Amino acid sequence: MQIQAIELAHFRNYRGLQVDFMPGVNIFVGANGQGKTNLLESIALLSGGGSHRDARDAEMVQWQEAYYRIKAMGTADGQPVVIELAFGGERRKLAKVNNRRLRRIADLSETMNTVVFSPEDLSLVKGSPAQRRRYLDRELSQASPAYGDVLSRYARVLTQRNSLLRRLREGSATAAELELWDDQLAPLAVETLARRLDGLARIAPYARQIYRGLSRDKEQIELTYRSSFPLPDDRSRWLEAYRKALQERRAEEIARQATLTGPHRDDLQLFLNGRDARIYGSQGQQRSIALSLKLAEIAFIHQIKKEYPIVLLDDVMSELDPDRRQQLLSELESKNIQVFITTTHLHAFSPEQLGRAGIYRIQAGQLSRSNE
């Protein structure tokens, strides 16, 4: 899908906004704190994956207002599409596509997909395992809402099991109760793990190919999945292996009041020329790997959905050196991908790039089209 126009009501610092967009590159320029990222966030929400800033819906409602509403008009497969997302009031949160209410907010990803690239993504390599798990989970959830459902159910059962572990330590629960939660957790853990590994097997070739191009065939990367428990070669034995791992660490889990084995403890390992990129990669190499992962995300979604996602570059251009900026924009423009970029200045763009882009000045939630 490509967005032709968007309307906001009571979203963050936008009381009301209506703006038309270009089919290619759109640049939002302004000082920090004026609403550039808020506008990108509103677009990201329309793909059903939640806020890329991990914000709660109530935090996105304008101060002293009761609701927010986002409406986008665009085209998909040559047909007009209208997406609406609202939060607040009696129904709390609802989503519509062409005036048809969706059963789940996550179903928005069937109509529109987005890939967000922010400065935090540049630390994907050296960051925490949780950051790399989020990268993988958000990507797979957009490609398949069913994966998002499995992940949500796993998280809910995990929370309940951790609560029971605390009660076990206090003496107010029994081992039999824990077995019941293990029965629910284990199949969800194994399904989450299987879907992650299958997804990674499709993403990794793109990342390897893209990184080879960025390094001009001088270096290569490998992506591997590190499970928190030993995985048998035979997938039919994974459930048994996971239950065994839970049993072996039960005393430790009760003592620490937390589940210590499962997909929530796994990691995506990144290797550069056979060595751990987190330890041995330079900052430039780590950023190139992060860039490769995000571009691989775009290619993966295109493979699944047969169309490119909308790309949101949130204050990331100033964090890249000129070569990587040029490589990124050239890659996106060559595929006719619709791109939204936030920046505090236009120095990072060539006159030719600015001439092709839609440029919008943002100040205190007010937006105006610029001719620069």
Curated annotation (Swiss-Prot):
Family the entry assigns: Belongs to the RecF family.
Subcellular location, record wording: Cytoplasm
Presence of the UniProt keyword DNA damage in the record: yes
Function per UniProt: The RecF protein is involved in DNA metabolism; it is required for DNA replication and normal SOS inducibility. RecF binds preferentially to single-stranded, linear DNA. It also seems to bind ATP.
GO terms assigned for molecular function: ATP binding; single-stranded DNA binding
Name of protein: DNA replication and repair protein RecF
NCBIfam families: recf (TIGR00611)
Any GO CC annotation of this UniProt entry: cytoplasm
UniProt cross-references to Pfam families, sorted A to Z: SMC_N
Binding sites annotated in the UniProt record for ATP: 30-37
Gene Ontology biological process terms, A to Z: DNA replication; DNA synthesis involved in DNA repair; double-strand break repair; SOS response
Gene3D superfamilies named among the record's database cross-references: P-loop containing nucleotide triphosphate hydrolases, RecF/RecN/SMC, N-terminal domain
Keywords carried by this UniProt record: ATP-binding, Cytoplasm, DNA damage, DNA repair, DNA replication, DNA-binding, Nucleotide-binding, SOS response
Matching InterPro entries: DNA-binding_RecF, DNA-binding_RecF_CS, P-loop_NTPase, RecF/RecN/SMC_N, RecF_2
Species of origin: Heliobacterium modesticaldum (strain ATCC 51547 / Ice1)
